[in-house]
């Protein structure tokens, strides 16, 4: 009886150890699966962040909406797209139906009389019904920007000031030694001064982002 009881106890202990070892192996397997799963999630998150980091940054802080229309007009009028994006961002923040208190309209905030003058210089009829169409508005604005850059020999500050205040006002300032010393222009309009700063800052940012994307593409 004693030996039988001892054998039964040994068998019971063996079964207990077997169940314990099996449970440990199962728990170990589950832990390894969780570790692998967590690693895959982290790797996927990093990959997604790398792919979408630039577009998210670009489109939320410094959008490049209507890119096809902008690039088409820039090729037509020999402009840097970064400058046009900077002007649109400053003028309307890419809102195609924007209307200012003064009556400027669309993405590049074209005044009706300015639109008529641009169309006349282009030898075309001004179509006010299309002023909120991105391609039409951008074409008018890019023509004007190109005209001003040519007039002021590529000076972005003067061109931006003229885009905001009109080239007649800028011409007066340039002829007045109180505002222009032959090198530096003091803009007497606070609104225009702030506008020029915003355009220049945005232009530099768009150029930086473009260069960053080119560098990333070469890696």
Model regions and ranges:
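N-terminal Lys/Arg-rich, disordered targeting/topogenic segments
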Residues: 1-31
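Extended, non-globular alpha-helical segments
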Residues: 26-37, 109-110
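Hydrophobic membrane-insertion alpha-helices, especially the h-region
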Residues: 34-52
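Catalytic glycan-binding domains that act on GlcNAc-containing polysaccharides
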Residues: 49-219
